[in-house]
Amino acid sequence: MEAFNLHKKAVSRDYIVKPRLEYRTVSAVNGPLIILQNVKSPRFAEIVNVTLGDGSVRRGQVLEINQDKAVVQIFEGTTGIDNKKTVCQFTGEILKTPVSLDMLGRVFNGSGKPIDGGPPILPEAYLDIQGQPINPQSRTYPEEMFETGISSIDVMNSIARGQKIPLFSGAGLPHNEVAAQICRQVCLVSTCTLVKRSGKDEEDFAIVFAAMGVNMETARFFRQDFEENGAMERVTLFLNLANDPTIERIITPRLALTFAEYLAYEKGKHVLVILTDMSAYADALREVSAAREEVPGRRGYPGYMYTDLATIYERAGRVEGRPGSITQLPILTMPNDDITHPIPDLTGYITEEQIYLDRQLHNRQIYPPINVLPSLSRLMKSAIGEGMTRKDHSDVSNQLYAAYAMGKDALAMRAVVGVEALSQEDLLYLEFHDKFERRFVNQGAYERRDIYTSLDMAWDLLRIFPVQMLRRIPEKILQEYYHRTSNYEHKENKPHSSRS
């Protein structure tokens, strides 16, 4: 009788008014995946609305098609799904997210639904969460330096607007505090002076924060920090917490980046996107791969993880003819502090910069515990120098790197032969090593140093050495800056002009 009623319903249905097909053919549930049989013309990446027996609705996406079978991943998890009462409706649409300027100042879950108790969003458009690939020919080379107010970043690993800057961290390290400090203090070098004088932030600056698998404490920390600093009205949060479905973490960064692209390329805003924790995202990717019984790659992660991560990281940048930009700050915790782990390893290949947080510096009460030696910025050279920061910037950075590396060698030598066997030069390098970490790298969480102050502090440290030992700095630069008592009084106020 039930079959007769279903057949009667199908025959009498008005497919013009209600064209979507519905199925009750769930044959298997495997982790975050369900398998449907006898499906008519399913499409890859098609969105499926899954209605459970209790009336709740979940969303899924077609991952794999084999004749009349379809493998669907459920974003909200498969708990409670059975093969009798579950109804699956194929929408014929890809996954899109509503976007609107009203989303600024709001909090959403990992699926893009409001969770702050505010009114529903009135969308201005629905955009594909996969975004549109940027033509390399239309990309604008990043040439405007972001001043973070952190000396070890601004002087030695300068950030350009439109860059990807992952924070390589570990469990228990203050990566959240460093990311929050960057958000509080970041501005263009060319506009920082104007911002200080007016006391106002850039009106066209916005922050999109996406959390994947973080605990409630981390989410509360960022939200409270934004609110206390009066920045919440230009911040949008997408929160997938540790107790939320794992599979949801795959779409959370894409929702955040889609909204960021809307702000940058449609509304002309300069957007900073914070993604934490990318390790949780990669683990979710591994879980889906294992459920699909794919051949695993290194440490069980899928072989296509490099490509998948690139679809996220490469959505940063600037587009010619568009006034906005997207700068990414992904945070990833390295398992066992292993930088050769597949997640940081592949991330380092894709991104143009990496900031490495060191546990030994953290144990010595140095904040931020940024180890400058494994850190790097591949786009730094185009964003610094005369007319942009100061003409001695590049040479000072090179000399700091060289002196700090020599200090590390002297430290290792002292542990073997003792301090009595060290030469006078080695003792100078040891002194520089200690003062570099205690004075230059170490600074307060709410201490902001502009680029000129940081460069002056670097010169104060380099004066530990006689002029003949500063071999990385040209003679002309040494004559101009080495004997100055206060370089900050002679700063070159020739900022790089902002570009639309």
UniProtKB/Swiss-Prot annotation:
GO terms for molecular function: ATP binding; proton-transporting ATPase activity, rotational mechanism. It comes from Cyanidium caldarium. GO terms for biological process: ATP metabolic process; vacuolar acidification. PROSITE patterns: ATPASE_ALPHA_BETA. Non-catalytic subunit of the peripheral V1 complex of vacuolar ATPase. V-ATPase is responsible for acidifying a variety of intracellular compartments in eukaryotic cells. Keywords: Hydrogen ion transport, Ion transport, Transport. InterPro entries: ATP-synt_VA_C, ATPase_a/bsu_AS, ATPase_F1/V1/A1_a/bsu_N, ATPase_F1/V1/A1_a/bsu_nucl-bd, ATPase_V1-cplx_bsu, P-loop_NTPase, V-ATPase_su_B/beta. It comes from the Eukaryota. One of its GO terms (cellular component) is proton-transporting V-type ATPase, V1 domain. Pfam families: ATP-synt_ab, ATP-synt_ab_N, ATP-synt_VA_C. CDD domains: ATP-synt_V_A-type_beta_C (cd18112), ATP-synt_V_A-type_beta_N (cd18118), V_A-ATPase_B (cd01135). NCBIfam families: PRK04196.1 (NF003235), V-ATPase_V1_B (TIGR01040). SUPFAM superfamilies: P-loop containing nucleoside triphosphate hydrolases. V-ATPase is a heteromultimeric enzyme composed of a peripheral catalytic V1 complex (main components: subunits A, B, C, D, E, and F) attached to an integral membrane V0 proton pore complex (main component: the proteolipid protein). Belongs to the ATPase alpha/beta chains family. HAMAP family: ATP_synth_B_arch (MF_00310). This is V-type proton ATPase subunit B.
